[in-house]
């Protein structure tokens, strides 16, 4: 642990009940090592202080990733229903966008944490894609002049879109927890 490392290095420099000091012959080298160990101990404490938040973010990311595959399945059903109904091109296109957005939401969740830390691009895309998804799904269900979509008329499509929006809310809640912990 960082505490053990710090105790041992400080013991080598000054001596303690477990370690005998190295003496003046090594004071220059110890003068270089001690600040590095102190910084490592401080950084380890900072990470440990964030352990609960980091664990929550990791759990939420896995949840969003899992939920995106469920969203994808329902979005593909909606797209298929629109094709079977010979829906207008705008509705077929919007249903196709839902399919694409579910894939990107999952991808953004998987790319969220990189070796370098949090990916700003993935954070931005996750928030943007979630907003777009809701707008399009609601437009397909209730109609949208802005998106040039008529409200869904058949019961099966309405049922699938309602289920999709319910699943979306669960995903958005998890994502909000992730995005909120980054601020």
Q: Which residues does each predicted region cover?
A:
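Hydrophobic alpha-helical segments
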Residues: 1-183
């Amino acid at each position: 642990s960082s505490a053990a490392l710090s105790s041992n290095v400080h013991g080598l420099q000054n001596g303690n009940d477990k370690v005998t000091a190295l003496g003046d012959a090594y004071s220059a080298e110890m003068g270089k090592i001690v600040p590095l160990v102190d910084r490592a101990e401080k950084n380890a404490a900072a990470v440990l202080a964030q352990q609960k938040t980091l664990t929550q973010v990791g759990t939420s990311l896995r949840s969003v990733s899992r939920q995106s595959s469920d969203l994808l399945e329902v979005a593909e059903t909606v797209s298929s229903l629109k094709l079977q109904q010979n829906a207008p091109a705008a509705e077929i296109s919007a249903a196709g966008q839902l399919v694409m957005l579910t894939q990107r939401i999952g991808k953004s969740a998987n790319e969220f944490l990189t070796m370098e830390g949090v990916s700003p691009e993935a954070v931005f895309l996750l928030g943007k894609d979630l907003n777009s998804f809701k707008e399009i799904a609601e437009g397909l269900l209730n109609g949208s002049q802005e998106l040039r979509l008529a409200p869904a008329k058949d019961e099966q499509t309405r049922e699938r879109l309602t289920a999709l929006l319910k699943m979306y809310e669960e995903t958005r809640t998890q994502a909000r927890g992730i995005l909120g912990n980054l601020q």
